[in-house]
Amino acid sequence: MEKKNLDWGNLGFGYMTTDYRYVANYKDGKWDDGALVTDPTVTLNECAGVFQYSQSCFEGLKAYTTEDGHIVCFRPDLNASRMKDSCERLEMPVFPEDRFVDAVEQVVKANAAWVPPFGSGATLYIRPYMIATNAVIGVKPADEYQFRILVTPVGPYFKGGAKPITIRVSDFDRAAPHGTGHIKAGLNYAMSLHAIVDAHAQGYAENMYLDPATRTYVEETGGANFIFI
C-alpha cells in the first residue's frame, strides 16, 4: 500500500487525524460488536462519568514497518492484559482481551497508509482507551462505557530522538502506596502534569520519582526507561 505523503523523518510526537478508528459500546451489561468508523469526534452528556468522576483508562503501543515491508506490533496481548487490570481496579467492564487484540489489528490494517516507512524513525502510535459515557451524579461507577482505539503517526517521544536527556529528582510523588500507580488510569497522568511542567521550566526533560513511602529508593521516571550500571 502506498504511504501518505508526509515528511516522515521530521514528525513530532503529536496527534494527527487518520482515516479510521475503532469504537465499541457497553450497555445493558454487554459489549456491542464494535466497528471501524471515520468520525473522530466523541459526543457525550455533560454529566458523563468520565467528566465527573474520571472513570477512564488507556493503553499505548506502536506499529512498525519492517525492512521487508510488513507491519508489526509488539505483544498487544500484554496491553490487553494490563487494560483488563485497569478496568477491574476502576470498576469498569473488561473489554475481552481477544477482542482487544483483534481491534488493534483491524485499526492498524485500516490505516496501513499511515504506518511510517522503515528507516524513517517514526512509528504509528496506537491508543486504546475506555471512558464512562452515561450521566452519573453521586460517586458511583457508570452503567455505560465506550472503548475506542485511535492511531496517529509520531516521531520520537523526546525531541532529538534516542539521545541523553537531563533528569531531575522530583519533589513530587508519582503514585501513592496501595493506590492506582500500577494501572494506566487517566487520573494518574493528570496528577503528573504539574511535575513535568515544573521540570521543563527548570530546564529538565524528565523527572525521576522516588518511592513515596520512604523517599529513599528510585521508583520510576515519567516517560522513559532507565538502567543503572
Where are these regions (language model features)?
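Helix-start/capping segments and mature chain N-termini
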Residues: 1-107, 136-229
